[in-house]
């Protein structure tokens, strides 16, 4: 009989934070453009090692309201926020990231920061 694999207890798991952002630009941007811009901003500002430690992960983007969610390691929230503020253009069009807020859960992030943009 096979044994069940052992799981990490919650105290040893890596903790994440979720950043809600709004993208303000000359034109509406697509999901793939935003995803690429976030990754490039992380790499150019934090470097390869810093990006590996921060573990930025694109969660969701609403093209209608131009708002989205990014997951990051809890120790590197401010570093990723800084990296996003340095973005000035995406594919040749002027754009800036506006951080709406940070939360420990997606549910709370949607309720507190993204509800006014129609997120449920």
From Swiss-Prot:
Assigned keywords, A-Z: Cytoplasm, Endonuclease, Hydrolase, Nuclease, tRNA processing
Lineage: Archaea, Methanobacteriati, Methanobacteriota, Thermococci, Thermococcales
Gene3D superfamilies in the record: Ribonuclease P, Pop5 subunit
Protein name as it appears in the record: Ribonuclease P protein component 2
Protein's UniProt keywords contain Cell membrane: no
Organism listed in the record: Thermococcus gammatolerans (strain DSM 15229 / JCM 11827 / EJ3)
Subcellular localization: Cytoplasm
Family stated for the protein in its record: Belongs to the eukaryotic/archaeal RNase P protein component 2 family.
GO biological processes: tRNA 5'-leader removal
Entry's Gene Ontology cellular component terms: cytoplasm; ribonuclease P complex
Known role: Part of ribonuclease P, a protein complex that generates mature tRNA molecules by cleaving their 5'-ends.
Catalytic activity: Endonucleolytic cleavage of RNA, removing 5'-extranucleotides from tRNA precursor
Alphabetical list of Pfam families matching this protein: RNase_P_Rpp14 (PF01900)
GO function term, MF aspect, one: ribonuclease P activity
Gene encoding the protein: rnp2
Quaternary context: Consists of a catalytic RNA component and at least 4-5 protein subunits.
EC number: 3.1.26.5
EC category name: hydrolase
């Amino acid at each position: 009989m096979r044994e069940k694999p052992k799981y990490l207890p919650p105290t040893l798991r890596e903790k994440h934070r979720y950043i809600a952002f709004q993208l303000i630009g000359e034109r509406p941007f697509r999901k793939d453009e935003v995803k690429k811009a976030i990754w490039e901003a992380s790499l150019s500002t934090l470097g390869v090692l810093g990006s590996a430690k921060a573990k930025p992960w694109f969660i969701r983007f609403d093209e209608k309201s131009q708002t989205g969610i990014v997951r990051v390691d809890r120790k590197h929230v401010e570093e990723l926020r800084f990296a996003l503020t340095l973005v000035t253009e995406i594919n040749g069009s002027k754009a800036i990231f506006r951080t709406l807020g940070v939360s420990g859960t997606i549910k709370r992030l949607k309720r507190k920061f993204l509800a006014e943009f129609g997120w449920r």
